[in-house]
A protein has these predicted regions:
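Carbohydrate-binding surfaces of carbohydrate-active enzymes
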Residues: 257, 266-268, 330, 393-445, ...
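Extended substrate-binding grooves/exosites of carbohydrate-active enzymes
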Residues: 455-456, 466-473, 490, 512-513, ...
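The substrate-binding groove and active-site-proximal loops of carbohydrate-active enzymes
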Residues: 463-472, 493-511, 552-571, 596-600, ...
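Polysaccharide-binding and catalytic clefts of secreted carbohydrate-active enzymes
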Residues: 553-716, 720
Length: 1019
């Protein structure tokens, strides 16, 4: 049976209603975006895309799907097309979505049905996150039926907000089917230039929603929906007419079958011309062939979908395999899928077999431990087995859950991973017992009464790195497994409703349960970071004080602290909660608010804040005439100032208003800090805020408080999903304090390799405490995309083993961390420019990327630090686009230059104060601010780079540090597999000890992609 993408359907029956999760064809090549003739005006017909030769990009395979309750291709299905001419990139997509759901406004398009498109214009992002030029935009229908295009991240080309330059059309194309068409001007994708470049990094998501809530998505690659990881994008390559080819895919209508079921096998074939085609289907059970059938179909340009219904007979074992060999004019392909015969009973038997194997291995492990063998590393596999079996066995007792999320194939896959894990662990233990493997004992200093010194956590005199999961109640039930996994930390939370549900009500059962859990955790040597976030607003408080629901702010608090009742609620919560838990010595930190921000004055302004601002401006300027001169406005008086309007039209006013917001936000944060210290004196405090908001132009202002001053108020710098640049920034702003990421997200797509690589890069760039979201066995689209820790056994094992490595090498890692604030090269961090120069954040990010591969650490230097003379060891200060500076900054820059400092800025840079008045001059060396230009400058100045790498193309990150008379250096290759020959003081290094493996290595060696290696060279 055949259904072409044009919509003609010839199906013998229907098989919608079941979730699908089948093995699929791997797609790893480029997509070829063919040229087309202008003009392309969009008739609203897929036939037009076919006529122009567009190749299909099928989002049809299992790896493309992040919709837990997907019910087959007749539920949600999407095929994308791209074309180009000299002026536009054309985007087309045919989408079937059985139950549409839309958002009221364009900024939330990703929460409804519609597309997100992400671009790495120069295909140059090699570090986690987005770099300066990366772009993310979206298309979709709004609730009122209109079509909208929106930019969430504009890179160097676009402002955040609605996209007027994109021509968009959305046309009904059949039952539950829409054709999306968009013309994106190439100028919107700068610095990509189709006249000079032929490829760019790209990802596309189709988001599907139900009842206004994001259900999940189909994507080409990971890297947008879960976390922003542009280095995972694949390439779109510009091609001429008729050049290149597309890829085929296969899927099934559900994840598992029973005897007698009908199965619907869908083939997505990249046909390019009309003609007759055939598919030869073969069904096998093991080596035995049980069915063979040949199906003819009519091939069309732009792709053809072949639907083949197969009536399953009796199923035995794990099921059947379908092999499909398709042939059509000009092409052929071979695909396969499994018709799985799974049942809870069968998987319970498999679980029992894994459990018995794990029990036998535990006995072996205990015997080896008693004999003095260091078993920390193979023990991680056993811990993963225990915890995975625990939660999956629970799942197997819940038929509705198994059906809703199509869990049986996923559970089967996890059990296979457990067996493979145990196999490796058994071999590793045998090697340790025989002496064939070198033991790597892991120190276990007590996780209680930790102190902070020189930017690091200490247990006594030992530096410690803290790593573990964030969850709710489940971590307290799994303390033994957490410890055996290699973790030394965990985190949990209580909300306001659980402590003070109303002004006259107090509940302490949750607090006492936390206290009991902490005492139990101490037995397993686990530290605890307590998220005491006073959110959401309890209904009892809102009923008593309805004003608390007005002017929402404070991140997850959801209520402005200008409300006296909100402050009273926070005080009451912590007054009752903290005395119950504060005396536990393994309570090492309090996280004050989940994803805190000071967002008062972003979209609306509280009357108290407005009055304070007007009074502050009157005090600052004295007369409205003086204020108007700075702002370039014609305001009548201070009492009529409207910040919400004026900040949109006056750069000088925006600077004054955002500076005022910063001061007010600091007062808010001091209130939170002082309240917590009142009830838990001596416990270190931090506050979690989303990291991207610090240095991102579209997300920066809502936080409202500068990271530097925020870090000075708390005991260490807290964040959520920090990237390498943010971590360098934090360590620079508060050099003597640790940095934490207390909500790092992982998805079901996170591989073991990525898990290890991300942890190492974060710690080496200054992170001392890291928590993974989330330790829970629950299911939702959000958790599968961003909190799937207990659903990826192999990756969880990799995290546990990496945690052991980090704990073992904590002194060496801390040595690298301390090199960041001692760096000789710094980037100027200018809050004034962050407020007033739209292109500054992107240029700052680009300069950081250019500096990241020159074999020396990079720090940030703030305007405040400059003015205070706190320049550390900085010899070179780079000013990338910070054109508006405080007047005292200009004076400090002149002083820095007078002390032999070098200031680098782009040619033609002109500096003014925040209001546009020219600043006194200071010596500047003009530079292109590229890696090559920086490298030449550093050689000229003789900067300290004792160990140099040899990998070309800016793909190597290398840092060095001296410790105890030895030279340490680490290397991370962000490019293809290359031969690596390091140089020490200009001479090739012959050999070194690789500290993670403990092995002696000889150079040159082959350096894999994103595998961290730490070397020690002794004198």
């Amino acid at each position: 049976m055949v259904r072409t993408l044009l919509g003609a359907v010839l199906l013998a029956g229907t098989a919608a209603g079941w979730a699908g999760s089948s093995p699929v064809l791997q797609q790893e090549g480029d997509y070829f975006c063919r040229a087309t003739d202008a003009p392309f005006e969009f008739r609203g017909e897929l036939a037009e895309w076919r006529e122009r030769g567009a190749l299909p990009l099928f989002l049809a395979a299992e790896k493309n799907r992040m919709i837990p309750d997907w019910e087959g291709p007749l539920d949600v299905d999407a095929t994308v097309y791209l074309l180009h001419d000299a002026q536009y990139l054309y985007f087309g997509a045919l989408v079937r979505d059985r139950l549409p759901s839309y958002q009221p406004g364009p900024e939330a398009l990703y929460r409804g049905d519609g597309f997100q498109l992400a671009f790495d214009p120069l295909d140059d992002t090699i570090l986690p996150g987005y770099d300066a030029n990366d772009i993310e935009l979206g298309f979709g229908r709004l609730r009122d039926g209109s079509a909208a295009a929106y930019c969430w991240r504009g890179g160097e080309a676009l402002p955040t907000g609605r996209l007027a330059d994109v021509r968009l059309k959305i046309t009904p194309a059949g039952e539950h089917t829409l054709l999306y068409e968009a013309a994106i001007p190439w100028r919107c994708l700068a610095p990509f230039d189709p006249r000079k470049l032929e490829k760019f990094g790209f990802d596309v998501l189709y988001n599907s929603a139900r009842d206004g809530k994001r259900r999940g998505w189909l994507h080409w690659t990971p890297g947008v929906g879960e976390e922003k990881l542009a280095f995972l994008f694949r390439n779109v390559r510009l091609a001429g007419k008729g050049e290149g080819a597309a890829e085929a895919a296969i899927n099934l209508d559900r994840s598992q079958y029973s005897s007698g079921d009908p199965a619907l096998v869908s083939l997505y074939l990249p046909t390019e011309q009309a003609g007759k085609g055939q598919v030869h289907f073969t069904v096998r059970q093991g080596e035995r062939e049980v069915w063979r059938e040949t199906v003819g179909f009519d091939a069309l340009p732009g792709g053809t979908v072949v639907r083949w219904p197969y009536q399953i007979g009796r199923l035995r074992g794990d099921g059947l395999q379908v092999d499909a060999r398709a042939v059509w004019p000009g092409g052929e392909t071979a695909l396969n899928a499994e018709l799985l015969n799974l049942s809870p009973e069968r998987l319970k038997q498999q679980a029992q077999a894994v459990a018995e194997r794990a029990l036998a291995f535990r006995k072996r492990l205990e015997a080896a431990r008693n004999a003095g063998v260091a078993v920390d590393y193979p023990l991680t596999a056993l811990a993963v087995c225990d915890v995975t079996l625990k939660y999956r066995r629970r799942d197997l007792e819940k038929p509705a859950l198994l059906k809703e999320y199509a869990l049986l194939p996923k559970i089967r896959r996890q059990f296979r991973q457990l067996n493979a894990m145990l196999e490796r662990a058994e071999q590793e233990l045998a090697g340790l017992e025989s002496g064939a493997l070198k033991p790597r004992p892991v120190p276990a200093p007590p996780m209680r009464n930790l102190t902070i010194r020189d930017g690091a956590f200490y247990s006594g005199d030992e530096e410690v790195l803290l790593i573990g999961p964030l969850g709710w109640w489940e971590p307290f039930d799994d303390l033994k497994s957490l410890s055996e996994l290699g973790f030394n930390l965990f985190s949990s939370t209580l909300i306001a409703q659980a402590v003070t549900p109303a002004p006259d009500k107090v509940r302490l059962d949750g607090a006492r349960r936390i206290d009991r859990g902490l005492r139990e955790a101490a037995k397993y040597n686990l530290a605890f970071d307590f998220l005491i976030s006073p959110h959401p607003l309890p209904q009892g408080w809102k009923e008593k004080h309805p004003e608390m629901a007005q002017y929402p702010s404070g991140g997850w608090i959801g209520s402005s602290l200008y409300h006296t009742a909100t402050r009273t609620m926070i005080d009451a919560m912590w007054k009752n909660l903290l005395p119950v838990v504060r005396d536990n010595p393994n309570l090492i930190a309090l996280d004050l608010v989940n994803e805190w921000s000071f967002s008062d004055g972003v979209r609306e302004i509280h009357p108290v804040m407005l009055a304070k601002f007007r009074a502050a401006m009157r005090e600052q300027y004295g007369s409205i005439a003086a204020a108007n001169r700075n702002w370039g406005t014609g305001c009548r008086d201070f009492d009529s100032l409207d910040p919400m309007k004026l900040k949109q039209v006056s750069t000088g006013f925006r600077y004054d208003f955002e500076s005022f917001r910063n001061r007010e936000g600091l007062e808010n944060l001091r209130f939170l800090r002082d309240t917590a210290r009142k009830y838990a004196p001596g416990t270190p405090l931090h506050v979690k805020s989303i990291a991207v908001t610090d240095l991102d132009p579209g997300q920066y202002l809502p936080v409202g408080v500068q990271r530097e001053e925020r870090g000075e108020i708390t005991d260490f710098a807290g964040s959520d999903c920090a990237g390498i640049m943010e971590l360098d920034f934090y360590r620079s702003m508060v050099p003597g304090k640790p940095v934490a990421d207390t909500e790092f997200h992982v998805s079901v797509n996170t591989t073991p390799h990525e898990m290890a690589a991300d942890a190492w890069s974060a710690m080496l760039h200054g992170e001392s405490l890291r928590e993974y979201y989330a330790w829970t066995g629950r299911y939702s689209a959000e958790l599968m995309a961003a909190g799937a820790l207990l659903h990826i056994p192999e990756s969880l094992e990799a995290l546990g083993r990496t945690a052991l490595d980090l704990r073992r090498l904590a002194p060496e890692v801390v040595a690298f961390q301390r090199r960041i604030p001692d760096a000789e090269v710094a980037l100027l961090y200018s809050p004034a420019s962050m407020y007033t120069v739209p292109e500054y954040p992107a240029r700052l990010r680009r300069a950081h990327a250019e500096l990241s591969h020159l074999d020396l650490p990079v720090r940030f230097l703030s305007e405040r630090q400059l003015a205070a003379g706190k320049t550390g060891k900085v010899k070179v200060l780079v000013i990338p686009g910070a054109q508006r500076l405080e007047r005292k900054t200009a004076e400090a820059l002149a002083d820095f230059a007078a002390r032999s400092g070098t200031i680098l800025a782009a040619p033609g840079t002109r500096f003014t104060d925040p209001y546009g008045t020219a600043l006194p001059g200071f010596p500047v060396r003009e530079s292109e601010l590229t890696a090559a230009a920086f490298d030449r400058e550093f050689d000229r100045l003789g900067l300290n780079r004792p160990v140099r790498g040899n990998l070309p193309g800016g793909a190597l990150e290398l840092r060095s540090a001296e410790r105890d008379g030895a030279m340490l250096f680490y290397a991370v290759n962000y490019g293809a597999l290359r031969e690596f020959q390091p140089l020490l003081d200009g001479r090739p290094i012959a050999e070194a000890t690789e500290l993670i493996s403990g092995e002696t290595v000889k150079f040159p060696l082959r350096l894999p992609n994103r595998k961290t290696m730490i070397f020690e060279v002794k004198p």
